[in-house]
Each structure stands twice: as structure tokens, then as C-alpha cells.
From Swiss-Prot:
The gene is rsmF. Belongs to the class I-like SAM-binding methyltransferase superfamily. RsmB/NOP family. This is Ribosomal RNA small subunit methyltransferase F. InterPro entries: Methyltr_RsmF_N, MeTrfase_RsmB-F_NOP2_cat, MeTrfase_RsmB-F_NOP2_dom, Nol1_Nop2_Fmu_2, Nop2p, RCMT, rRNA_ssu_MeTfrase_F, RsmB/NOL1/NOP2-like_CS. Specifically methylates the cytosine at position 1407 (m5C1407) of 16S rRNA. Transmembrane segments: none annotated. One of its GO terms (molecular function) is RNA binding. Its main location: cytoplasm. It is an enzyme of class 2 (transferase).
Length: 479
């Protein structure tokens, strides 16, 4: 594999020599950093089983190597990487897999280790959505996830990835993560804090990642991380699990942050060792039981993961002074909800008791029941999935609801050819050889729902959202 030139400040190299255990070779560390990062993907088991995915993609000649800490994760090699970007494959467009760095699959593996089955989870720094979607898959779209992102520009990307993967149990917020301890005390069974960090572990992906690095900036970032983990710990219920992770390598932003929390709440913090998380985990194990992953150990990005339990309650923080505002939705009455459910089933949309119907003007939404306890405590950027808009002739079903709820076995499902599916993703109407009978047609490809179309004569009118329309070369190889 080709080398690339990574910029290393001298002070960084000194710090790494001190941080690295004697069992590891510093020369191996430098060599690993110079190698480009291996590509990796995670199968979205909300859409397809791993076995079915492997069978579906077998004709492509992809080399898929299992990632030890994630049953759904694989390093991927393709003979001609430039011929078609992974993001333009049919399987990616329909949400069958997520392009995710292997080491970033570790925190969620730790969160659900030892049979942990949380019902309400918070992802404090969620964009672009790799870990939120991984959590949702582990929860099988049950329970509820609060996915927060401080950066306004990244909330849109987070929502797009959640929608593509067919996730229905997520509420999105846009806050500084330091507010949650006061705003939502003891509300979560599990919390993932993948903290903002100095990014020392990502040099294999970005050779210039350390251009603005300094020991002083590490100290400043660590101060913010301490405030974030303190807030997250307050939002965690007693008995709950907190996973703290970063993609950096210095001890100041990693072990020291966790040790600070234990010193602050000595009777409430229990470190849960991760040495048995997967075969070979002991190679990265610290004396505290954390995983400090240097890039040469598993040939991946540098990463850090700690898991801890809140063993007892801690003093609550003063209530926040901000006003949430009126919640603009109201629950749909049972009789009307039954009519809506029946109409939705007619086009192949079904949902279980984990979701409840709410209404705002002419909009119909499905919210996860597990998030209702948070209503009135925080302001949501987006909650659940938009099911439909009502109009005089019935309902205008929404694309995100189709992707999350549709059954491809519905009587009105219509399977497209590869060429027709590509036309669909380009936002064009489709002219199948044999037009379907129904007026509302659930469009599928590879037996996966990809949208809803209106039949007009022999034409299927495209309803694919404009913001998702793709140009350029797609999976049939035609530009």
C-alpha cells in the first residue's frame, strides 16, 4: 500500500513516546501512520442480515475482512476503487451499509457489551451519524435515541444518514452538550460521549491533521471534555452505562478525563474493563481497563474507549434557565389513528407500538414512545419520522417513512430493473415494460424499498426527494 507524508510536530512525537506502552514499537507507530487508512463498512442490519448482504455483494468480487469488534463490520478492498465510489453503489443508496472507520465501531460495541440492553440512549456528539445508526441497529429500532449535534451545519447531514438507513427511533437536538446534565438529569440508560478532540488518531486519513496541534490546545480541549463528561454523567441514571471515546492518542484527553470524573465522584464511578470486548482486545488494554488503540495494533485509526457505570445518584445541577417553548404537536386520537394506520398499510407502511402518531396542522408524524418523557424539557430539531401530509383526497406519504417502514412484500410493491432504479435515483420518471396495476406504487430494487411512485398511464411519476437526486456514474456504469 502506498505511503503518504504525515506532518508530525516534534512535541507530539515526544508526547507519544511517553504515552506508548513499552510493549509497542515506536517505529511501528510511525510506519502505521504513514500508511493510508483501510476502507471499512458496516452492514445495516435494520435493512438486511449480514449473510444476505454477503450473498448479494458476492458477484462484485469485493474482499470483505471481518472486523473483530463488530459482527456487522468489514474492511473492504475492491479491485478498481476508482471505477465507482462506494457511496454510489445501489447498496449504499438504499441504506444497506454505512461507510464507517473500523475503530469508530468500537464505542457502540462497548456500549452494548455484556448484554447491556438500554431503552433510552443519548449520543452527545452524533454527526455525521455513524454511531447513532449503529446504536439504532443494535436496538433494532426499538426504544429511543436522543442524537445531539452542536454544529448546525452537521445536523442536516446527521438527519440524511438517519433517514437513508431507515431509522425511526431517533430525536435530533442541536445544543452544546454541556446543557444535558442540568436539562435532563438521570434520564438515560446509556450515553455515548464521542468527545470533540485533537484528532491525533486520524493522520492516516488526513496527513495534515496535526498542522495546528500544540500541547496547549490539548489542555484546552481536555477542559471542555471534562465539562462534557460531567454533564453526561449527570444525565445518566444510576446503574446506567457511559462510554467515553475520542479519536486522539494523548493521555490528557483520554485516561486523564476519565480519572478526573472518578476523582470528582469517587463513590459513583465504576470503570468497567474492556479486555474481553473482543479477541485480542488485551493488546490495547490500559491498567484502568480502557482501550487505548494505537494505529499499529489493529491497522486502523488511533482511538480511545472507556466504559463506566454510574453506581449511585449524584447531586443534581441547578435547572436551566432557558425556555423550551410550546410543543407544536398533539397526539392523534385512537379512532383517527386507526384510520391512518389502515390507509398506510394499503401502501405497505406498517409500524409497531414503539411509535405513536402525532399531528401538527396537516402533518402526521411518528414519534418513539420512549422520547415522550423528554417533551417540554428540551427543544427538538427533529423528532421521529414524518409519515404524511393530509390533503382532500387522502395522504401524501413521505419518503423517509417509506424507507423506514415499508415492507417490500406488499402487494403493491414493484421491483425495478437496475437501469430503472438508476433512473429513479437520478430523479427521472420510470417507464417500465409492464406497468403495475395500483395507483400508489411502492418502488423496490434488490427487494429494498427505495420510494413511492404514482402510476400515470404507463409512467411511474418519480417522488424521490430533490436533495437526494444523484448525478454522475452510478451502479450500472452509465454516466
Amino acid at each position: 500500500m502506498a505511503q503518504h507524508t504525515v506532518y508530525f510536530p516534534d512535541a507530539f512525537l515526544t508526547q507519544m513516546r511517553e504515552a506508548m506502552p513499552s510493549t509497542l514499537s515506536f517505529d511501528d507507530f510511525l510506519a502505521a501512520c504513514q500508511r493510508p487508512l483501510r476502507r471499512s463498512i458496516r452492514v445495516n442490519t435494520l435493512k438486511i442480515s449480514v449473510a444476505d448482504f454477503l450473498q448479494l455483494t458476492a458477484p462484485y468480487g469485493w474482499t470483505l475482512t471481518p472486523i473483530p469488534w463488530c459482527e456487522e463490520g468489514f474492511w473492504i478492498e475492491r479491485d478498481n476503487e476508482d471505477a465507482l465510489p462506494l457511496g454510489s453503489t445501489a447498496e449504499h443508496l438504499s441504506g444497506l451499509f454505512y461507510i464507517q472507520e473500523a475503530s469508530s465501531m468500537l464505542p457502540v460495541a462497548a456500549l452494548f457489551a455484556d448484554g447491556n440492553a438500554p431503552q433510552r440512549v443519548m449520543d452527545v456528539a452524533a454527526a455525521p451519524g455513524s454511531k447513532t445508526t449503529q446504536i439504532a441497529a443494535r436496538m433494532n429500532n426499538e426504544g429511543a435515541i436522543l442524537a445531539n449535534e452542536f454544529s448546525a451545519s452537521r445536523v442536516k447531514v446527521l438527519h440524511a444518514n438517519i433517514s437513508r438507513c431507515g431509522i425511526s427511533n431517533v430525536a435530533l437536538t442541536h445544543f452544546d452538550g454541556r446543557v444535558f446534565g442540568a436539562a435532563l438529569p438521570e434520564m438515560f440508560d446509556a450515553i455515548l460521549l464521542d468527545a470533540p478532540c485533537s484528532g491525533e488518531g486520524v493522520v492516516r486519513k488526513d496527513p495534515d491533521a496535526l498542522k495546528n496541534w500544540s500541547p496547549e490546545s490539548n489542555q484546552e480541549i481536555a477542559a471542555t471534555q471534562r465539562e462534557l463528561i460531567d454533564s453526561a454523567f449527570h444525565a445518566l441514571r444510576p446503574g446506567g452505562t457511559l462510554v467515553y471515546s475520542t479519536c486522539t492518542l494523548n493521555r490528557e484527553e483520554n485516561e486523564a478525563v476519565c480519572l478526573w470524573l472518578k476523582e470528582t465522584y469517587p463513590d459513583a464511578v465504576e470503570f468497567l474493563p474492556l479486555g474481553d470486548l473482543f479477541p485480542g482486545a488485551n493488546k490495547a488494554l490500559t491498567e484502568e481497563g480502557f482501550l487505548h488503540v494505537f494505529p499499529q495494533i489493529y491497522d486502523c485509526e488511533g482511538f480511545f474507549v472507556a466504559r463506566l457505570r454510574k453506581t449511585q445518584a449524584i447531586p443534581v445541577l441547578p435547572a436551566p434557565k432557558y425556555k423550551v417553548g410550546n410543543f407544536p404537536f398533539s397526539p392523534v386520537k385512537d379512532r383517527e389513528a386507526g384510520q391512518i394506520r389502515q390507509a398506510a398499510a394499503g401502501v405497505g407502511l406498517n409500524w409497531d407500538g414503539n411509535l405513536r402518531l402525532w399531528q401538527r396542522d396537516k402533518e402526521l408524524w411518528l414519534f418513539p414512545v420512549g422520547i415522550e418523557a423528554l417533551i417540554g424539557k428540551v427543544r427538538f430539531s427533529r423528532l421521529g419520522i414524518k409519515l404524511a401530509e393530509t390533503h382532500n383526497k387522502g395522504y401524501r406519504w413521505q419518503h423517509e417513512a417509506v424507507i423506514a417502514l415499508a415492507s417490500p412484500d406488499n402487494v403493491n410493491a414493484f421491483e425495478l430493473t437496475p437501469q430503472e432504479a438508476e433512473e429513479w435515483y437520478r430523479g427521472r420518471d420510470v417507464y417500465p415494460q409492464a406497468a403495475p396495476v395500483a395507483d400508489d406504487v411502492l418502488v423496490t430494487f434488490q427487494h429494498q424499498p427505495i420510494g413511492l411512485a404514482k402510476r400515470i398511464g404507463s409512467r411511474l411519476k418519480n417522488s424521490y426527494p430533490r436533495e437526494l437526486v444523484r448525478d454522475g456514474k452510478l451502479f450500472t456504469g452509465n454516466a
